[in-house]
Amino acid sequence: MNLLKSLPPYILVCSLILTLQPIQGLAQEASGASASSGAERDGQHDFDFEIGTWKTHLSRRLHPLTGSNTWTDMDGTSIVRKVWNGRGNLVELVADGPAGHFEGLSLRLYNPQSRQWSLNFANISDGTLAPPTIGEFKDGRGEFYSQETLNGRAILVRFIISQTTPDSCRFEQAFSDDGGKTWEVNWIAVDTRVKDE
């Protein structure tokens, strides 16, 4: 201890700097590695392709999980707006067809910790949010899952977004009442971007 007191202060400071320099370098390397790996896996911009106005063609199974294969078609418009600087978006869907008029709203929120999206859907007929479907995009395909009830039965819901290009995309919803062993598709939407005039 007496040796430290006898050294001039500038030598102590220089010794500390030289001693800590390798540690700071390691910390910078580690934080740089985690930042770059985090940036590679960040899905915050997964839905950027969809911002704008789209013409949509919907096919909907009228009575899912009943053995019925009766479908109805609808045509309409989907408007997608970015919110929260891209960490969310709002979808407004309006469509009409032989089965009537449909209006839906979807609030999609990105969770940066899990790097997943929650898709929260409501339609005008009941005015309530369905349980969110949770998932992510991998290799250009989005898969989202939830558990809901249909006619008093617990079911699984799978929502897939695929075939995404700057001007078109496909959405498919399916239900399973056997724990995901089999899936019955009940909603298909094909969207085509409305070009600016």
Task: Kindly give the residue locations of the regions a language model identified.
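N-terminal secretory signal peptides that target proteins for export/translocation
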Residues: 1-6
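Bacterial N-terminal signal peptides
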Residues: 9-22
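Hydrophobic small-molecule pocket/channel-lining residues, especially in calycin-type beta-barrels
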Residues: 26-197
